[in-house]
């Protein structure tokens, strides 16, 4: 069996899909804070410094970091979309990757709806099968999913109503 993801939340990470934030951070203004779920406009230099520190930490531990925009650079539609999506940096929320493939998450925040399909395009280009997706009216984000065994996950809300809704969990059953 080809393996794509991790079997548990505590194993060794070998490869990770990430998005380096760019011009889309300028979309976070006082008028869009609620839509994109930010507390204040982004201090881009600090945000990028923190991101680069995390990227370097992964790489220093031997983790292969795959950048979303590198995978999608020839996809003009995806690249245009990303330029308007300041939360794209948080790729963990958008898919859960199992040994047999990925399940695309269903973001709760309206300002994130559709972002999972961009990550799905990248995963497909990387050869990761898409096993299913969480669709409205349900929602479930990657922060509410913990892998506990081969192709077995526990889904739970981190904060009531913020990360999952029961129909999401039912729809995530792909096997």
Per-segment meaning from a language model:
Residues 1-175:
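The feature marks the mature, well-folded catalytic cores of soluble enzymes
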